[in-house]
């Protein structure tokens, strides 16, 4: 069993049972939807993408770009910048903000570079009211920032708990000789402040922490 992608050279049904993955193309599309919702569907935006050739992040970026082009004609993608290190998020975002001061939104890859971009935005004198960041990968840091109304305005998340359940189920079925699909997709989830409590429960299978719930009510 594999999560997200198999090892090169291995054959499904022979060398491994199945791949269980999020729908990464849809995940990227949801990121575009969240950015459009955050900035009102119009304005100049930029994107930070993972420059290394990695199938999962490639699909997410493709989904994001395709959705922008097809669904949001009033949003102009004025700049894209690749990074090969999530810890360079602040550096990359600072350059984008300096060169394109009119951008009102940013796709910040996943949580670590996105929070670096949030720091860059703050240093540049931007506020969560005039600059929005969206990202993939739901963790405690971006969830907390979203809850308190910070720069993180939307997240497109995998459902790793449910992916784990699917992987265990598929593996168990294979052990008893039952047929198992060679590729299993778990749908992603778009998260904003409005659905954060429900989304947190869906993703982690536990309730939203009290501090985040309190921030939502402020």
Briefly describe each language-model feature range.
Residues 19-45, 88-90, 137-143, 159-176:
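Hydrophobic alpha-helical segments within soluble ligand-binding/sensing domains
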Residues 48, 52, 67-68, 159, ...:
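Hinge/cleft segment of the Venus flytrap/periplasmic-binding protein
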Residues 1-26, 44, 139-148, 152:
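Flexible loop/hinge segments that line or gate small-molecule binding clefts
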Residues 64, 78, 82-145:
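Hydrophobic alpha-helical
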Residues 49-59, 107-112:
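Extracytoplasmic "Venus flytrap"
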Residues 1-4, 18-21, 44-49, 78-79, ...:
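Structural recognition of the beta-strand scaffold that forms the well-ordered cores
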Residues 27-31, 55-75, 88, 92, ...:
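Short, solvent-exposed amphipathic alpha-helices that sit
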Residues 44-47, 68-86, 128, 187:
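Short beta-strand elements in bilobed, periplasmic/extracellular small-molecule ligand-binding domains
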